[in-house]
Amino acid sequence: MMAKATMAFCFLLMLTTVMLPTEGKTIAGRTDCEQHTDCSAASGPVYCCQDSDCCGGVDYICTNYGQCVRHF
């Protein structure tokens, strides 16, 4: 039982490490979406990754490909 739990933990740790971008200025190397004025939004601030790909706000992060991803 303990071996399965350890294997699962190691797998999740490895997966998390691989999935995280290496560039960035925030915790775990993720880059916060920066506020950007060129994107039009219905309400609230709009954030973009690398001046493109509009995000919905501060609850998003940018991948190292410049895509917005919601973080939980």
From Swiss-Prot:
Subcellular location: Secreted
GO cellular component: extracellular region
Propeptide regions on this chain: 22-30
Major location category of this protein: secreted
Post-translational modification: Contains 4 disulfide bonds.
GO molecular function, one term: toxin activity
Tissue-level expression: Expressed by the venom duct.
Tree of life domain: Eukaryota
Keywords: Disulfide bond, Secreted, Signal, Toxin
Signal peptide: 1-21
Transmembrane domains' residue ranges: none
Family, as annotated: Belongs to the teretoxin H (TH) superfamily.
Domain commentary: The cysteine framework is XI (C-C-CC-CC-C-C).
Protein name per its UniProtKB record: Teretoxin Tsu11.2
